[in-house]
Amino acid sequence: MCIRDREYTNPATLGGMPNELDKWMAAAFQAVTCRTAGFNTIDLTDMRASSLFFMVLLMGIGASPTSTGGGMKTTTVLVLLVSTWGLLHGRRDTVLFDRRIASETVDKAYNVFTVCLLWMLGAYFLLLICDGGLHRADYVLFEVVSAFATVGLGVGITPDWNDWGKLILVLTMYAGRIGVLTFVLSFLHSKDDKIRYPSENIMIG
């Protein structure tokens, strides 16, 4: 719906299609393929910035668990939204479909979201440096999120980057596919905490 609305009057994309059905089908296909398929029937470089941003959001959310897709995963985002909704309404538990979600699951969802966001922002920053201002910033962001979510979509700027830029993109693909927590923890040594410290309240917000 969002892609159709933004591209409806764009003559280079949906605006140049002959009938309404073609526009709806092309917009729906482009939205669905952001999950992991990597196909496109519209030239992405002709799309408006708002459409590309919407596609970035879809790619960042990614596919569902146990699938071949990357990204943060749909269940992670769902748990975050439900937890935030409950917090705003003063609920102590996170409840979904009359079932209480374990606090450990909620904590893991927040951790996954935080690490994924930090990874993508870090890769985005480094690739902006490697890009050297050759391309639009939203194009660079699109490439980063597409790589992290292992979608396969692109705006054709990757060949212009140096070896360091391509290496960053490759590592981002691995992190997104394996799972960023698993990828990061594979390089770290976990240890059991033998000391439990006293709690402290910190002002938030």
Model-identified regions with their sequence ranges:
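Membrane-proximal intracellular helices of multi-pass ion channels
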Residues: 4-205
